[in-house]
Amino acid sequence: MKPLSPLTLSFLLFVFITTLSLAFSNEDVEQVLDVNGKPIFPGGQYYILPAIRGPPGGGVRLGRTGDLTCPVTVLQDRREVKNGLPVKFVIPGISPGIIFTGTPIEIEYTKKPNCAKSSKWLVFVDNVIQKACVGIGGPENYPGIQTLSGLFKIEKHESGFGYKLGFCIKGSPTCLDVGRFDNDEAGRRLNLTEHESFQVVFVEAEANDAEFIKSVV
């Protein structure tokens, strides 16, 4: 492995210190942890589960909704015993590899159906139900449907327990929480909301414990 030059090393150290300084200058910013108190790291595989298990349902997975021909809509499984599909978090650009609350991130599934252009999460506008919903893929998967570019983030939930996801629209100061919407489908859709956010926790997924795409409908 080629050793890093002093200039590169200094730059990376500067980025790391600057990020930490910005993070800890805000008392509300903290490192995101999984249910076992371990830090969440980019590239790791995690299940997104409801903070309160039971009738509220299980983890998040993919499903086919509306007139979409590919299972690209992100749904919360109605079955509380299901963990859903694991995701990984990516910090765009150069980063110290630490995810704090409020850090802009990309979220993507570790597996995707062949018909999906990408495994990355995005937001599409379903005009039938008048909701901005979370999905994966690319514009090709949403013919005639508006898709929104932007980045996600993780914040502490208002209750003080668990976290919530947010989405910030590219080129706009607008950021909205991710909530749930029940449209009497195979699962509850994840959608952008100004009201009740989806209270979640993160569970590290074992490599041999991932559910496969056959679980989608």
From Swiss-Prot:
Its main location: secreted. GO terms for molecular function: serine-type endopeptidase inhibitor activity. InterPro entries: Kunitz_inhibitor_STI-like_sf, Prot_inh_Kunz-lg. Keywords: Disulfide bond, Glycoprotein, Protease inhibitor, Secreted, Serine protease inhibitor, Signal. Residues 1-26 form the signal peptide. Gene3D superfamilies: 2.80.10.50. Glycans are attached at residue 191. The keyword Disulfide bond applies. It comes from the Eukaryota. Disulfide bonds join 70-115, 168-175. It is found in: Secreted. GO terms for cellular component: extracellular region. Might act as a protease inhibitor involved in plant defense responses. Belongs to the protease inhibitor I3 (leguminous Kunitz-type inhibitor) family. This is Kunitz-type trypsin inhibitor-like 2 protein. The lineage of its organism: Eukaryota, Viridiplantae, Streptophyta, Embryophyta, Tracheophyta.
